[in-house]
Regions:
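Short His-Asn-centered micro-motif
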Residues: 152-155, 176-180, 201, 222-225, ...
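RNA-binding accessory domains that recognize and position tRNA/RNA substrates
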Residues: 1-148, 165-178, 182-206, 217, ...
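Hydrophobic/small residue at the entry helix of a nucleotide-binding pocket
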Residues: 158
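Catalytic cores of extracellular degradative/oxidative enzymes
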Residues: 204-211, 215-230
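ATP/NTP-dependent adenylation/nucleotidyl-transfer catalytic domains that generate, transfer
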Residues: 2-31, 292-293, 307-455
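Short acidic, glycine/serine/threonine-rich loops at helix termini
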Residues: 163-164, 185-190, 209-216, 255-260, ...
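Short helix-capping/linker segments at secondary-structure and domain boundaries
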Residues: 77-89, 236-244, 342-353, 399-406
Length: 455
């Protein structure tokens, strides 16, 4: 369906309300959104309560502010169905600076959505937002003496590396999972954490949204890591935890489309991390502290670190295609990227065991390789490392295999025959010693990264 026609037909989107139901076992939050003239949507979240927590939400303006804010990021999944030009926020109150903050998140967080749907928009006119609600009444129940870490677990190598770096703090660590699945649960287990140390929340999508997507309404990527940030703040507050420890690396800052600001990983970027940190400190004030443990590192360094974490090698999963079946599909850009980035540090035989496919010998992946290494203007719309890092990993693997007297796999043979090895070799020292100073790590965590990753 045409973007302009949809905006003309469905001119208003309303964030109507949120409802909080609390029992001894959980807190359930139900949101109500409406595309005027098309449909209402009522997605919900469930946050588990540990025994003895007592009443949390009742008459707690801080908790309501967190819930309202999660709704603000949740709404974009429903707004994008028609991209209504007017958004009316009736569920709470926002000032002009907050409205500008949310619009910036939506605009950049939907960069891939606009690009893949062929939509050209400008930040100053893609949406008008008006605040029509009131701030919550009740006490602003700030918790003192928050301590410990909560690590969001995605099931891939990055959160496994964060857990391994925080091994000595294990007694005060918790793992945070949205909608548990095989790889996330296995990561928690392999890290040596039991059920008591896992905070598993449930997020639902309204079925009506899926129906409308199937009917041809607009669909595409939304800033999921922003959902993680706002929901994790609620979970950390409920469990008296100070630090929300993400696993986003420096390479997440690179744009997906060369020469543009379109970034599949925008809400994993340092810009979003800083922006969220400022927003939370200014408007929510939960007392939690959100930062990425791996921000100083490149994907290359993370892969080197992960290669030493053998307890996770058979259970980690990053493949979106195979995520529902908890497998590596062995044919997508994400699988090929992870295969390449680990190839200097693990043998080809071991990688073939892990992925169930010898991907470097699969010539049908040649076009995907070209995207990953920068021979195409766009990187795949996946969470993958920078083009230079992937080239460096391939060069190191070629060096390793030739030193061992082994025949090069087909993709690496092509790479070398095209002169790419000569063009890109010799950069590894830069990535082995790379340290991005743009990060928010508290000193004690920065010290851990420096001690364990720069030897």
């Amino acid at each position: 369906m045409d973007y302009n026609e949809l905006r003309e037909t469905y001119k208003e989107f309303i964030y109507k309300s949120y409802n909080i139901e609390e029992t001894e076992e959980k807190i359930r939050v139900t949101y109500k959104f409406e595309i005027v003239g098309l449909s209402e949507f009522t997605p919900y979240w469930e946050f588990p309560k540990k025994s003895g927590m007592g009443q949390i939400a009742e008459n707690n303006a801080l908790f309501e502010t967190m819930v309202f804010s999660l709704g603000m990021v949740e709404l974009v999944s429903y707004w994008k169905i028609t991209c209504a030009p007017l958004v009316r926020v009736q569920a709470g109150a926002l000032n002009e600076a907050q409205i500008a903050w949310w619009k910036e998140l939506y605009f950049h967080g939907l960069g891939e959505f606009y690009y893949t749907n062929g939509i050209e928009v400008k930040q100053d006119d893609f949406m008008e937002m008006v605040s029509e609600g009131n701030a919550p009444t009740g006490s602003y129940l700030i918790k003192e003496n928050l301590k410990g870490c909560m690590v969001p677990i995605g099931g891939g190598k990055d959160s496994a590396v964060t857990l391994s770096l925080l091994k000595e703090q294990k007694d005060s660590n918790y793992c945070y999972i949205i909608n548990p699945r095989g790889a996330t649960l296995n990561t928690v287990k392999s890290g040596g954490y039991n059920q008591d140390k896992m905070i598993a929340v449930k997020r639902t999508l309204d079925k009506r949204m899926i129906e409308l997507n199937q009917q041809g309404f607009l669909n595409g990527h939304t800033p999921f890591s922003a959902i993680v940030a706002f929901s994790a703040t609620i979970a950390a507050y409920m469990n008296d935890l100070k630090y929300i420890v993400l696993s986003n690396e420096s390479s997440a800052n690179e744009s997906t489309v060369a020469g543009s600001t379109v970034n599949h990983q925008y809400s994993k970027s340092f810009k979003f991390e800083k922006d969220f940190h400022t927003y939370e400190e200014t408007y929510i004030k939960s007392g939690t502290y959100y930062f990425s443990m791996l921000r100083p590192l490149s994907e290359f360094q993370i892969a080197k670190q992960f290669a030493t974490c053998s307890e996770y090698h058979d259970i980690f999963r990053s493949c979106n295609v195979g995520s529902k079946e908890d497998i590596w599909c062995g044919h997508c850009p994400k699988c090929l990227f992870v295969f390449f980035i680990l190839s200097p540090f693990l043998s080809q035989e071991r990688l073939t065991e892990i992925f169930g496919a010898d991907m470097m010998n699969d010539i049908t992946m040649l076009d995907t390789m070209k995207q990953l290494i920068g021979l195409s203007p766009e990187k795949p719309f996946e969470c993958v490392g920078s083009r230079d890092e992937i080239n460096t990993a391939i060069c190191l693997t070629i060096e390793k295999l030739e030193a061992q007297g082994k025949e090069l796999p087909e993709l690496l043979e092509y790479y070398k025959s095209e002169g790419l090895y000569e063009q890109n070799k010799g950069r590894e020292q830069y990535y082995f010693t790379y340290y991005d100073k743009e990060h928010l790590l508290p000193e004690e965590f920065d010290k851990i990264v420096k001690e364990k990753c720069y030897q």
